Regions:
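Domain-level signature for soluble enzymes in the chorismate/prephenate branch of the shikimate pathway
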Residues: 1-139
Length: 139
């Protein structure tokens, strides 16, 4: 059970290539794509109808792209600083990602008051942060 998004941990999962590589998704047929998330990678390329080879990687996957072990990577991007440092760039955003509160069904029932109060406090905090952010952008 997922009662609410949390107001932190916002990032995105993206397809990443070496900087300056001018390529379209369609031209990636047969490419070797490295990722810590091979199932998401396979699903993405399958949905767009492009056959690629997916390589499961661990650790700093950006080094595999920089070293030429893979043609591209799929990884989580927050600020993009790591990409810039490693001469990489986002080619395509696959999906937005955020932290979420997850409650198991038994706790939802046995600790309803506590869980409900926690969810309500988080939602209130999100509204306050959103209002503060909106005021900051208007100034």
């Amino acid at each position: 059970y997922m009662p609410t998004d949390l107001p932190f941990g916002k990032c995105r999962m993206s397809l990443i290539v070496p900087r300056g590589r001018k390529i379209s998704l369609e031209e990636m047929e047969g490419y070797k794509i490295g990722s810590k998330y091979p199932e998401i990678t396979k699903s993405f390329f399958s949905n767009v109808g492009i056959r690629v080879k997916t390589l499961k990687l661990n650790g700093a996957v950006e080094l595999a792209a920089k070293a030429g072990i893979v043609d591209a990577i799929v990884d989580i991007v927050d600020t993009g600083n790591t990409l810039r440092v490693n001469d990489l760039e986002e080619l395509h955003k696959i999906k937005d990602i955020s932290a979420v509160l997850i409650v198991n069904r038994i706790s939802q029932k046995t600790k309803f008051a506590f869980v409900n109060e926690l969810v309500n406090r988080i939602k209130k905090l999100k509204r306050e942060l959103s209002a503060k952010d909106k005021r900051g952008r208007e100034q």
